[in-house]
Amino acid sequence: VKYKIGNGVMLIQPSASKDRTLQTSEPSPAGHALKADDLLPESLHQFLACETPKAWLQWALENPATLLIDHAQCEKKAASTAMSLLYRYVDQPLLLSKMSQLAREELLHFEQVVALMEARGVAYQHLTASRYAEGLRRHLRSNDPERLIDVLIIGALIEARSCERFACLIPYLDEELAKFYRTLVKSEGRHFEDYLLLARQQTSDSIDERIAFFVAREAELITSPDTAFRFHSGVPA
């Protein structure tokens, strides 16, 4: 699938002040009618413990280049994670099938974001990672199957949060970028369910308590202060 990029200008909402106290208010919509609420499954809303704070949304609109660069990084990391699981767990046919499909899809999205960046004059540069993924992975247990269960739960949370943030951004972005993000929500909206399915497959015991633990940690990371904007950062410090 190819996307027409247009004139290469990302809409940035004007701000009368850089006072961070203003970031708790709703940014002004971009003027088109595009949304993605109809594409997000209800199960995704129920899975996440909190919505993306308005302060992060305003922060994202103030950092359009970083948003795209880190988005590309996220797609590449998602593909890398899927490939790593493919190599490590060759004895699980369902995991191989799900992760193979996911890796191809994430790499396609990576290519699309990079093409979009090039069309808009955004140079791909190295960004330090946010504390988000590492803040979740620090709780990984050491041995399988417990470790794999944790990895899969974390994968589910990252996928769910990514789609939720795409949907949050859509009304405030220029129309062509909003259309692109809407296609991502449509194609990736249920990836988190695949991760949870695989996690539950690893044991006959309930993993609900472990899921609840990571959901709570994820919400803490999303709502706590960060000094650098990233796609999965918390609120501005």
Label each PLM-derived region with a short phrase.
Residues 1-6:
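Extreme N-terminal basic, low-complexity initiation segments
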Residues 11-14, 18, 23-237:
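Non-heme di-metal
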